[in-house]
Amino acid sequence: MSIIEFWLEAKATIDRLIEQFLNSNRDWDLVDISSYILKDGKRFRGTLNMFFTVALGGDIKDSYGGALAIEILHSASLALDDIVDLDATRRGDKAAWVVYGNRKVIFITNYLIPTALRIIQTSYGDDALNTSIELWKDTSVGALRDMYDNSDYIRTIELKTGSLFKLSTVLSAYASKHYNTKQQMLDVGKYLGIIYQVIDDFVDYKTKKVEEIDGSAKQLFKYYREGKLEEYVRSVYLEYKQKYDELISNIPFQSKYLSEIRSLPEFLANGLLKEANIDKI
């Protein structure tokens, strides 16, 4: 099965898990807001968790708790980001705060986030919970650096984006019971997250006016101004793809998945580029 086929099947499964999660909480007064926040989405992060779980020899059903929790955390973080950034659209529709207002969205995300962490603890234990809390803290630090510190672009995107990718991949070590691969799987997520975000920031320069650029992409302006944006982005992509390739050679993945594992950086990058009608870097 190709990674695209796996993603399509995993996405359908994650959508079903989210629907079941919402149906089990029909007593919420704010269930409609939760449904709105969690709807749609590419489900890349949850898919990575499911994919690496089976690649490590685990049962895909053991990844369901992690995949669900990751997508809840990701969607909640986006809803909060939209409030902070005053972004009026999300996933092709109005942002949740535009529809429901800031207060309700903040209240419901404050419920969703600990609920997701509880799912992780219930599914994989206290060590997985502690790891998840530390990564969620890193996400918050990354958001602060994104807004107020332009000193280290790579560190910013590792924290801002890489942390949830790291959560996606490290939970596969727990789900597959390959606990000895925990640090390696954290690094897998780190490298994929950096690759994903640098391409995403590059796309911003190709699809927006310069004055509309915000977030971590603003830290790339000096390369844009000097006419070196493509060169820099390509160098980051190749550097972290090489690190990723070297790393996965030392992880006990099942051989039948190795080809698709190696293709993941290209899959993530090309997905972002093609969505923006960009052929290549």
From Swiss-Prot:
Its cofactor is Mg(2+). Its EC number is 2.5.1.82. Highly thermostable, remains fully active after 2 hours at 80 degrees Celsius. It comes from the Archaea. Binds 2 Mg(2+) ions per subunit. GO terms for biological process: isoprenoid biosynthetic process. It catalyses: 2 isopentenyl diphosphate + (2E,6E,10E)-geranylgeranyl diphosphate = all-trans-hexaprenyl diphosphate + 2 diphosphate. InterPro entries: HexPP_synthase (IPR053655), Isoprenoid_synthase_dom_sf (IPR008949), Polyprenyl_synt (IPR000092), Polyprenyl_synt_CS (IPR033749). It is an enzyme of class 2 (transferase). Keywords: Isoprene biosynthesis, Magnesium, Metal-binding, Transferase. Isopentenyl diphosphate binds at residues 42, 45, 74, 91. GO terms for molecular function: hexaprenyl diphosphate synthase (geranylgeranyl-diphosphate specific) activity; metal ion binding; prenyltransferase activity. Belongs to the FPP/GGPP synthase family. This is Hexaprenyl pyrophosphate synthase. The gene is gdS-2.
